[in-house]
């Protein structure tokens, strides 16, 4: 099977500015130190593939109460629309593309892990390549585990031809193993040169492991790895919330892991435009297709004068960076439910008017999430003092010096405190792909999402794409409710 390999093109922006160069068979690649770098860089390209992001926002945001399909009313009704109403099926194109793209990433990490060890490279550099591969493989598998449950574990470049689902426990064990090994192999963020920022780091591996343990309700382990990040001295919160998403603060002090956003002109699948253009303002100014619009429910859920609402939602009539937002003439300014025409401000790209070559980085792990992971795990362990301390750090930054808003939370009842932490996660991490999974893992989904079409014992997991089941002669057992 051919492996598409990418090389750096010498621009000073970052190592992820990549172009297609050649096709080299896995049988003879990589062999040299130069090949090892190319193979390592090729893993990251999957994160920038439009098909990766086309799975992200319909599943992670539009299936929640935070976002709507968006675009104009008739656009993508058969592909994106069903995620808003829980009417998608096992043949949905976006689900299929997401599954295949995640396994493409896994395949590329396996090439590095299988073939880089024998290459004669300086040991610390080789360790870094292997650590990057283990982190990225864990990231891809964590998306699969969260979305589908137990999935096929393909941990080498070759298989015996029999592909079956592993248990969820075994899937998470593989993820944890990769991340623990990555922690020992990777450098800290501060050890990288500026042109290598965006590569996996020890802090990113620890932060992802904290998230993975949180999702498994292993509170002590979630606390341990969150504290490792907190105490590393590598990260802190940006003083101004909206700067955490600003182009001028990419790879900044709050960024634990983000995807570089230099796209390839003219290649819609290779570029980061799959993330920004899909969600950009539709109509005037022409910034994108307008999918994944913040919902009225999300807007109304913010506390009074919370700056994070304005930093998350673009409204018609606003002026951003000197550009007036008129919106889409095919979309009602306010529909019959009271929903205004809105857009996701966290993907706003100043001065950009074309779909390709978008330069907005996507933040995958922020330090704020790590603080909230710790707060939640401490609250679950009934340590309200520590939980409130980390919760207050997040809220204090959100105030931006205005003592009259977002009062400090003092609740110590465990259940009530957890409710407040989940609300804080909703507002701090809005439109970043957490809300649906937070509702599912906390048991809140039936009550919150039931009116939108969510069915208990079905929609907690996505369906295995039918095409994948056909390829494996139905060896992949379908998830409950999707048979």
List where the protein language model places each region.
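Acidic/polar-rich alpha-helix caps and helix-coil junctions
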Residues: 11-60, 70, 79, 85-274, ...
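Short, cationic low-complexity segments
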Residues: 275-293
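Sec-dependent bacterial lipoprotein signal peptides
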Residues: 1-9
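Conserved, charge-rich beta-strand/loop surface module that forms ligand/interface-binding patches
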Residues: 293, 297-298, 306-308
């Amino acid at each position: 099977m051919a492996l598409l390999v990418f090389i750096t093109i010498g621009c000073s922006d970052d190592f992820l500015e990549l172009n297609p160069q050649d096709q080299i068979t896995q049988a003879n690649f990589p062999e040299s130190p130069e090949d090892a770098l190319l193979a390592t860089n090729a893993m990251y390209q999957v994160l920038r593939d439009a098909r990766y992001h086309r799975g992200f926002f319909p599943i992670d945001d539009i299936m929640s109460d935070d976002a709507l399909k968006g675009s104009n009313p008739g656009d993508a009704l058969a592909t994106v629309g069903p995620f808003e109403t829980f009417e998608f099926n096992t043949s949905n194109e976006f689900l299929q593309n997401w599954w295949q793209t995640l396994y493409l990433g896994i395949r590329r990490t396996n090439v590095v892990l299988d073939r880089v060890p024998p290459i004669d490279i300086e040991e610390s550099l080789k360790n870094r390549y292997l650590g990057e591969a283990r982190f990225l493989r864990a990231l891809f598998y964590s998306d699969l585990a969260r979305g589908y449950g137990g999935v096929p574990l393909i941990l080498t470049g070759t298989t015996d031809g029999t592909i079956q689902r592993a248990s969820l426990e075994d899937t998470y064990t593989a993820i944890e193993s990769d991340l623990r090994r990555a922690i020992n192999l990777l450098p800290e963020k501060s050890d990288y040169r500026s042109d290598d920022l965006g590569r996996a780091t020890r802090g990113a591996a620890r932060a992802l492991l904290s998230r993975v343990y949180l999702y498994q309700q292993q509170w002590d382990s979630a606390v341990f790895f969150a504290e490792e990040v907190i105490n590393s001295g590598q990260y802190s919160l940006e003083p101004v919330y909206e700067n955490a998403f600003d182009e001028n603060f990419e790879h900044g002090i709050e960024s634990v892991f983000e995807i570089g956003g230099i796209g390839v002109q003219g290649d819609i699948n290779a570029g980061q435009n799959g993330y920004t253009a899909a969600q950009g303002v539709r109509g005037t100014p022409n910034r994108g297709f307008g999918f994944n619009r913040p919902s009225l429910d999300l807007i109304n859920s913010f506390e009074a004068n919370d700056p994070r609402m304005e930093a998350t939602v673009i409204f018609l009539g606003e002026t951003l960076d000197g550009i007036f937002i008129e919106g889409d003439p095919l979309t009602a300014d306010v529909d019959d439910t009271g929903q205004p025409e809105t857009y996701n401000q966290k993907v706003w790209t100043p001065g950009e008017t074309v779909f390709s070559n978008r330069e907005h980085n996507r933040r995958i792990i922020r330090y704020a999430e790590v603080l909230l992971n710790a707060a939640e795990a401490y609250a679950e362990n009934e340590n309200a003092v520590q939980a409130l301390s980390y919760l207050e750090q997040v809220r204090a930054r959100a105030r931006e010096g205005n003592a009259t808003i977002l009062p400090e939370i003092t609740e110590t009842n465990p259940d009530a405190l957890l409710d407040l932490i989940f609300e804080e996660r909703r507002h701090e991490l809005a439109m970043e792909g957490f809300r649906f999974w937070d509702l599912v893992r906390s048991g809140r989904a039936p009550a919150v999402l039931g009116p939108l079409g969510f069915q208990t014992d079905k929609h907690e997991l996505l369906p295995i794409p039918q095409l994948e089941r056909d390829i494996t002669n139905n060896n992949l057992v379908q998830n409950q409710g999707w048979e």
